[in-house]
A protein has these predicted regions:
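Short secondary-structure boundary/capping segments
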Residues: 29-30, 59, 92, 125
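Beta-rich strand-turn-strand
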Residues: 103-118, 123-127
Length: 198
């Protein structure tokens, strides 16, 4: 994205036009954000800024569009109607290193997500997530270890790559260019020639 377009988007979207600008904003208000963090389509994400000192995001974290991260709960607006007492609910959220949070996941307050964790699309994380695991569902539960997931992906990637090529050829009558197969590049290219960019 060129610089002028980026500046206009960030003005229109109040600093949420691109990942770099939004992360800069989060750091400025007090969120602890590590290195190599990408927030995809930040204007579609809802990261609680009410208590920025209660949120930590580690290194190599990828957060996809539609993700919500909450450090507080406003349900006291109902319970205070019972007796006039406001019962605050603020809790820390810690996301450790090498974490992938898929589209439309919700991370609730008082949650710690360990290292090397994948959170599935649409999941609602209400409890801590241990290291080296994949979580999914509502509420999110551990569905397998990261090692099991990695093995499963490696077993299916060739079959999926063939499906991508066949579908593309069927639709267009042409063989796809390499860039269409970016997820499968290491099936047919030397890994040493590439530095994979997220």
């Amino acid at each position: 994205m060129n610089t002028i377009v980026r500046k206009i988007m960030n003005l229109l979207l109040k600093g949420k036009g691109d990942s770099e600008a939004y992360i800069k904003h989060l750091r400025k208000i007090g969120v602890k954000v590590g290195n190599n963090v990408i927030i995809y389509s930040p204007y579609k994400c809802d990261i609680d800024e009410q208590n920025p000192h209660m949120l930590e995001i580690g290194d190599n974290v990828k957060i996809l569009a539609g993700t919500t991260i909450l450090t507080h709960d406003f349900s006291w607006c109902v319970t205070s109607g019972l007796d006039g007492v406001v019962s605050g609910a603020v809790g820390k959220v810690i996301i450790h290193d090498n974490v992938f949070i898929a589209r439309h996941a919700t991370i609730m307050r008082n949650v710690e997500i360990g290292n090397n964790v994948i959170i599935g699309a649409g999941s609602v994380v209400t409890k801590d997530c241990e290291d080296n695991a994949v979580y999914a569902g509502v509420p999110a539960k551990k569905i397998m270890s990261i090692e099991e997931f990695h093995k499963k992906r490696k077993e299916h990637q060739l079959e999926e790559a063939v499906t991508v090529v066949n579908q593309y050829y069927e639709r267009t009558g042409e063989m796809p260019q390499k860039n269409l197969l970016r997820e499968y590049i290491f099936l047919f290219e030397n890994r040493k020639n590439y530095k994979f960019a997220y």
